[in-house]
Amino acid sequence: MGVCISHEYSKPTAQETEIQQQFSNFSKVDERPPMAVEHQMYDYRQAYEEQDDELFAIICCPHSIGFDRDKIALIDLDPTSDTYCTIISEIRLTSNGDEPGRMNWAKSAESLIEMDKLIRKNIIVPCMNSGKIYVIGFDKNKFYMEKSKNIFKLQEIRSDELFRKDVSCPYAVRSLPLKGAPVHVSTMGDRYGHGKGDFVLIDRKTWEIRKKSDPTFSSFGGDFSLQPRHNLLISSEWGHPRLFRDGFQPSELENVSESFGSCLHVWQISPPKLLQSIGLDSFDGSLVISVKFLHNTDCNHAFAISAIGSSIFHLHMNTLSREWQADRVAHVPSLKVENWVSDEMPALLTDMIISMDDRWLYVCGFLHGIVWRFDIQDPFRVSLHGKINLGGVFDSSPEVRIKTSNAMEDRWWLPPETRSLPRGTKFRGGPALMQLSKDGSRLYVCNSFYKAWDGQFYPELISDGGQMVRVDIVDNEMRLNKKFLVDMKDQPNGPFVIRDIKFLDGDCTSDSFL
């Protein structure tokens, strides 16, 4: 996909010039190669030994049917608490059908050891369907709508403010650990719902949108990741919002579709500038849904996954030419099936998590119902290390069968397993989004990604609501915790689904280290 030019831009302000100077100072500190094969990783056990385990989590809960408002909720994760696995605080968004995307804190820690010291007061919630961006305050385990200068006005960035800048469908949020730096929010469409990859910059003092000093945008937008030490941003491509909001067509699951992007874009953060666009294979890279840098700031390596292409890519830079390239290091093959919407079923990779020590990569297959664990200590030679079954189409719809006789011998595949969860329930849908504890011992998994996709493949998610489960990493094996379950089926005014998970003191996805 190509890159286009916008018409609305302005010269850098004095504050933006100061931020650019901060970046230039950091870029001169260290000119070492980006990474050795045996790279130095965070000793998370030493940094984390005096910290409590995560006791609370903020989760995003869209209303599954849409006749009531979505909400953001605080969940008790303390096993010794009387309110374990229940909502102890919540706040409703202001309108129906917002459909929140990937929320995040407005502040980022500079390093792992600074995470527990950082005071996080505001969480940014972008909404894919309504186009709004909410600023929600959080203090003493309570939510409140952040006020603007007019104390009577609830703080939300309305969709018409984005339309005036010809952007829509805000999706992901990242923050820089620099004083005065804005919050970055990726957008995936123009005002008409056509594909357009751009960014909205939000001032952390006024919560107003800053003017862009660079007019460039990409054909499609999606997820993105920041590497402040190297002044880099990498963004991915989804597709046209007006099309993916209606779910998938059967042909799009088997063939290359122009509805979805297959590129990764490397940007300079400040001053903003597109450095390179990386075209992936049109099918293997179809719908690049997530991209993440390693946590180690000395390493500017990253990983990306594609949903329909069901592939994992390793991104790295040639130190001589300074050119980036993306190598496909793993591919989950589609399964030939019958009695389903298509003759082939991709894994539909929807999320990935890199452990804080940069040793492990977790990837979830929404349709196959499997979470895979990869060893990425050598990012050029990624190896599959473990897997666990959590629902999936074959568990949800027994009439769907696999045609290939050797599927059970496939190293990627696990036969569907109906697991008995607390309160006599089973895991509905498939693994969609994840969060990992900082010590890498607990993987939290929820089963909603986007309601149009949820309802298409798993109608029971819409009728019965979402869930969150916990997978414990014990002796390098993934084991489902039978005592943990958050179930939204019987919530008042529900049902709700569960999407996105954030810990109060930061997690493996919240911060962009410097």
UniProtKB/Swiss-Prot annotation:
Keyword Acyltransferase: no
UniProt keyword annotation of Oxidoreductase present: no
Pfam families tied to this protein: SBP56
Entry keywords, A to Z: Selenium
InterPro entries, per database record: Se-bd
Superkingdom of the organism of origin: Eukaryota
GO molecular function list: selenium binding
Family statement drawn from the similarity comment of this UniProt entry: Belongs to the selenium-binding protein family.
Record's protein name: Putative selenium-binding protein
Organism: Caenorhabditis briggsae
